[in-house]
């Protein structure tokens, strides 16, 4: 089985979000199962110089972008057993950020065509092209409507993964002819038209052989108007070709037993050593080293989608529970400013780091007692899985992947890995924090919850097995896809 992953970002080369983690980890697990998986992404100017120096140019071609002809170089790099291909065009990709440019429609129209055009040139004929998010959404559409007439492409299948339905790649109608070389007949509700515009995401949803998303619950949610971002009707129509497969985490990177960033290594059998990491974290942030005061952590984008407005609404009540709070992230100015103000209001209780540091994130996971993630919606979420791996008990809203990964603690059976609430409501969240706080006082029960959380397997191995099944079933044409 030959699979080409096409992504707009990938660890360790360039990252803005969770997509990069998936693109970095899942191919490695698929390779362990015997799949010939390769990854293709743009050669951004932001890729570190030492990595760019290792790339080898293997092909040059010309790609159509409307009436223009644009240069395309293909560079190759072997990294940790995986072959990576980089689409090189400095005009499009040598920028100071990955996204958010006035010509993103043109940049990713070019990228989608470049991916398809280069395959015969580099002599790689994948069975499956696995595309991720809107940046690659036109690949399944162009393959179906144009490239499949060529025998080289005729047997290829496409899988499209929705990482976040909110970001859809919506552009003016003129993009069809000007950039995509497509006629106006495709500006229709059956094809690319989306409320008077062209949607790259919709292009993939109408044309991919199979659609996946990153958790079983999110798969169900996006078929409803509340979560469906105006695409719920289309997703319901394609529900027989829609599968939810939970993301994993890289359990080598996130391993408290071997983590080079934390003060003291520990695992589920030496869980008492976590308290040393807590003390180190408190000292790092110049907080009082109080063992009996729980540290609640937030490692997140500071946005309304992540539920930060709920936290803001009842922040004073949370601190009144006699807790310490540490926040790491960047986002909307409203929340950055609020949390910075709260460090002045509660100098012995609150710390915030506006920015992101991988090392500090690891130290927070290792030192925190609780991990707060009250998202409005969460396709999968990695933070709660990392937190459980480190014994930081998650407090989450029952949505998307949070619902699939965190089992709410049952005081009768003593089963569970965290605490959950259903409604997107600040006081429901506050009550859940208070409930967690009460069990924190019961050390034996709290240790049970921590151990149960740390014992869960959220590695990529299970997910990779399901994707491999999916590819096999797709190529077999059975029409019966993996059960979640």
From Swiss-Prot:
GO MF entry, a single one: alpha-1,4-glucan glucosyltransferase (UDP-glucose donor) activity
- Matches recorded under InterPro entries: Glyco_trans_1, GS/SS, Starch_synth_cat_dom
Q: What class of enzyme is it?
A: transferase
- Matching Pfam families: Glyco_transf_5, Glycos_transf_1
Kindly indicate whether the keyword Thylakoid belongs to this entry: no
The EC number(s) this enzyme carries: 2.4.1.21
Binding of ADP-alpha-D-glucose, residues: 15
Which reactions fall under this protein's catalytic activity?
[(1->4)-alpha-D-glucosyl](n) + ADP-alpha-D-glucose = [(1->4)-alpha-D-glucosyl](n+1) + ADP + H(+)
Kindly list the residue ranges recorded as spanning the membrane: none
Q: Which Gene3D superfamilies match?
A: Glycogen Phosphorylase B
Q: State any GO BP term from the record.
A: glycogen biosynthetic process
Recorded metabolic or biological pathway in which this protein acts: Glycan biosynthesis; glycogen biosynthesis
Q: Which UniProt keywords apply?
A: Glycogen biosynthesis, Glycosyltransferase, Transferase
The similarity annotation says: Belongs to the glycosyltransferase 1 family. Bacterial/plant glycogen synthase subfamily.
Task: Give the protein's function.
Answer: Synthesizes alpha-1,4-glucan chains using ADP-glucose.
Question: Entry's HAMAP family?
Answer: Glycogen_synth
* Protein name listed in UniProt: Glycogen synthase
Q: Which organism is it from?
A: Anoxybacillus flavithermus (strain DSM 21510 / WK1)
Coding gene?
glgA
């Amino acid at each position: 089985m030959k699979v080409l992953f096409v992504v707009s970002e990938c660890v360790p080369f360039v990252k803005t979000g969770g997509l990069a983690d998936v693109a970095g980890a899942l191919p490695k697990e698929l390779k362990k199962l015997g799949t010939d998986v390769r990854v293709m992404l743009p050669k951004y100017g932001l890729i570190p110089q030492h990595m760019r120096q290792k790339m080898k140019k293997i092909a040059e071609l010309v790609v159509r972008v409307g009436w223009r002809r644009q240069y395309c170089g293909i560079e190759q790099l072997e990294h940790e057993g995986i072959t990576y291909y980089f689409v090189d065009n400095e005009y499009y990709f040598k920028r100071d950020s990955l996204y958010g440019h006035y010509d993103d429609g043109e940049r990713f129209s070019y990228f989608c065509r470049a991916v398809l055009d280069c395959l015969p040139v580099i002599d790689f004929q994948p069975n499956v092209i696995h595309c991720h998010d809107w940046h690659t959404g036109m690949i399944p559409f162009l393959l179906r409507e144009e490239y499949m007439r060529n025998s080289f492409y005729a047997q290829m299948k496409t899988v499209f993964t929705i990482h976040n339905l909110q970001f859809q790649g919506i552009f003016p109608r003129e993009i069809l002819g000007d950039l995509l070389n497509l006629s106006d007949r495709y500006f229709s509700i059956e094809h690319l038209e989306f409320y008077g515009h062209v949607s790259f995401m919709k292009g993939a949803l109408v044309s991919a052989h199979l659609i996946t998303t990153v958790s079983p619950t999110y798969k169900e949610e996006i078929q409803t108007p509340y979560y469906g971002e105006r695409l719920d009707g289309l997703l319901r129509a394609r529900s027989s070709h829609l599968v939810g497969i939970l993301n994993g985490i890289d359990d080598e990177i996130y391993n408290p037993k071997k983590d080079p960033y934390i003060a003291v290594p520990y695992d589920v059998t030496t869980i008492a050593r976590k308290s040393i990491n807590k003390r180190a974290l408190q000292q790092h942030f110049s907080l009082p080293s109080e063992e009996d005061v729980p540290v609640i952590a937030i490692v997140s984008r500071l946005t309304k989608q992540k539920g930060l407005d709920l936290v803001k609404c009842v922040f004073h009540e949370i601190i009144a529970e006699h807790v310490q709070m540490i926040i790491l992230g960047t986002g909307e100015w409203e929340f950055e400013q609020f949390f910075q103000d709260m460090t002045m209001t509660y100098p012995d209780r609150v710390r915030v780091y506006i920015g992101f540091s991988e090392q500090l994130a690891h130290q927070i996971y290792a030192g925190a007692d609780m991990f707060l993630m009250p998202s409005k919606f969460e396709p999968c979420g990695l933070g709660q899985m990392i937190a459980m791996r480190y014994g930081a008990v998650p407090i989450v809203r029952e949505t998307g992947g949070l619902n699939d990964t965190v089992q709410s603690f049952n005081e009768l059976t003593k089963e569970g890995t965290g605490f959950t609430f259903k409604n997107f409501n600040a006081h429901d969240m506050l009550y859940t924090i208070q409930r967690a706080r009460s069990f924190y006082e019961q050390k034996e029960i709290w240790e049970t919850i921590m151990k149960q959380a740390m014992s869960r397997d959220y590695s990529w191995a299970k997910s990779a097995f399901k994707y491999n099944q999916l590819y096999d079933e797709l190529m077999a044409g059975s029409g019966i896809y993996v059960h979640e």
